[in-house]
A protein has these predicted regions:
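A conserved mid-protein helix/loop that constitutes part of the nucleotide-sugar donor-binding site
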Residues: 22, 205-218
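Nucleotide-activated donor-binding/catalytic signature segment of Leloir-type glycosyltransferases, i.e.
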Residues: 239-249
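Nucleotide-activated donor-dependent transferases that construct or modify glycoconjugates
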Residues: 3-17
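A nucleotide-sugar donor-handling region in carbohydrate enzymes
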Residues: 141-209, 232-234, 238-239
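Conserved nucleotide-sugar phosphate-binding/catalytic loop shared by glycosyltransferases and other
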Residues: 34-92
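Short N-terminal targeting/anchoring amphipathic segment
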Residues: 85, 96-113
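A conserved nucleotide-sugar
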Residues: 216-233, 237-240
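Short amphipathic alpha-helix
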Residues: 21-31
């Protein structure tokens, strides 16, 4: 009998951003359309991030919240394992308490702080693993790995993953939300002879406040175009950006 439960281990925050969560939600939405029930295991959450998952109508399970430590994302040797806030062993065991009850047919992991250490603990318990990555910088042990980075090659993962793993590499495997797919034909028909519109997006969190920096720079330029900024409500200086945007258009 086919197992239609899928678990996602993913986080989002001001320093992690929203990208990992959003691509997992896109995949979960597709799976839901095909009869699967998706469960999200999330740590270091805030209310706004929780609401994103709740609105998607997927099942949400909260891992024990840890005290957030200060992370300097500009330091020369940034360690992504800091993102977990706990060791991989602790993270897995706390996740496994939910996984064991759910009994999923597949566990999806999208987290820069998780590598082969976590994966092996899962495989030892007979779990099927689907890993999402776009760094190619660490060891993995899984059944399937998806990396949609343009130009990504198998050689990039040579010696970094178990030989029997299925590799889905390159932008042909991009996870794209339905609303963007529906607009593709319209986009291809657009008149591209002149620049009339500009869209700027620095992600759902924009921890470095680049949206405001770009906006202030564009204000100094004499551009006869419509400029659209896309941002999440967790973006820094949200109200200041809204006020400045009215001066640009």
């Amino acid at each position: 009998m086919k197992n239609y439960n899928v678990c996602f281990r993913v986080d989002a925050s001001s320093f992690i951003g929203m990208g990992h969560l959003m691509r997992c939600l896109s995949l979960a939405d597709y799976l839901k359309q095909n009869g699967y029930k998706c469960h999200f295991l999330v740590r270091n959450f805030n209310t706004k991030i929780l609401n994103v998952v709740k609105r998607s109508r997927h099942s949400l399970h909260l891992l024990p919240k840890k005290k957030m430590v200060s992370i300097n994302i500009n330091k020369s040797k940034f360690i992504y394992s800091d993102w977990l806030q706990v060791t991989q062993q602790v993270d897995f065991m706390e996740s496994y308490k939910f996984i064991k009850k759910i009994n999923p047919g597949l566990v999806v992991v999208d987290h820069y702080g998780i590598d082969k250490t976590w994966h092996l603990l899962a495989k030892q318990r007979g779990l099927k693993l689907f890993v999402l990555d776009d760094l190619g910088d660490r060891q993995h042990y899984c059944d399937i790995l998806l990396d949609t980075t343009p130009g990504r090659k198998k050689d990039d993962y040579l010696g970094k993953i178990n030989r029997e793993a299925i590799l889905l590499l390159g932008n042909n495997y991009c996870i794209i939300r339905d609303e963007f797919l529906k607009l593709r034909k319209l986009s291809l028909r657009r008149d591209r002879t002149r620049l009339s519109k500009l869209m700027v997006s620095m992600g759902g969190m924009d921890a470095d406040n680049n949206t405001l920096k770009i906006m202030e720079k564009l204000k100094t330029l004499d551009l006869d175009i419509k400029i659209t900024f896309i941002m999440g409500n967790e973006t820094k200086d949200y109200k200041k950006i809204i006020a400045l945007s009215k001066q640009l258009n």
